[in-house]
């Protein structure tokens, strides 16, 4: 497996295979299947997404820092399920598949993640059992989560040290079948 610095990764744009990305200060993260197409219509790959996160990490990490993560993973890219395909759900509510081929994941097994990935065992009102959430701590963790196929990140609105005090709010307006004009009107 080739070992690259972040500068080399951004400049050389390896289009396939697996690499070890040297983040400096003794940290490295394995990035795999860079050639996997995540957005078929655009031809954009997993490697393109990882390069994007390397390039914006300095700007987004202060907002993600120390927040538990709910991941929406698309390990095979964004691909609508064929008509009639079954949407799978796990019984405990920690993972479920969507019609676009993605699934939400909250529970990570601490025994299966690299040592640099911090997890926090938390119980919420929605979840009757404790869940091991990944916690955004640094670029290595962010890239590890993206390498799992995470395209949509849903960080908690509070930080680990003060979970009962969110420091921002989001109004998530999902139109589903409603006309876009209705969403715009509601937002105003």
Language model segments and positions:
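Active-site loop/lid in soluble adenylation, ligation, and acyl-transfer enzymes
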Residues: 10-23, 27-167
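N-terminal nucleic-acid-engaging modules of covalent nucleotidyltransferase systems
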Residues: 1-12
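A generic structural motif
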Residues: 37-38, 175-179
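Long, well-ordered alpha-helical scaffolding segments within enzyme catalytic domains
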Residues: 52, 181-188
């Amino acid at each position: 497996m080739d070992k690259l610095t972040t500068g080399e990764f951004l400049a050389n744009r390896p289009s396939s295979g697996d690499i070890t990305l040297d983040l400096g200060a003794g940290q490295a993260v394995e990035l795999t299947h860079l050639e996997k197409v995540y957005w078929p219509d655009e031809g954009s790959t997993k490697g393109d997404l990882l390069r994007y996160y390397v390039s914006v990490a300095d700007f987004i990490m202060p907002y993600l820092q120390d927040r538990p993560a709910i991941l929406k993973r698309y390990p095979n890219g964004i691909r609508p399920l064929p008509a009639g395909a079954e949407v799978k759900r796990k019984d405990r509510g920690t993972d479920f598949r969507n019609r676009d081929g993605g699934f939400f994941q909250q529970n990570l097994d601490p025994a299966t993640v690299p040592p640099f990935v911090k997890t926090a065992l938390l119980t919420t009102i929605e979840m009757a059992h404790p869940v091991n959430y990944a916690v955004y701590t640094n670029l290595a963790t962010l890239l590890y989560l993206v390498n799992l196929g995470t395209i949509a990140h849903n960080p908690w609105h509070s930080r680990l040290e003060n979970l009962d005090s969110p420091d921002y709010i989001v109004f998530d307006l999902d139109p589903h079948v409603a006309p876009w004009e209705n969403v715009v009107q509601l937002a105003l």
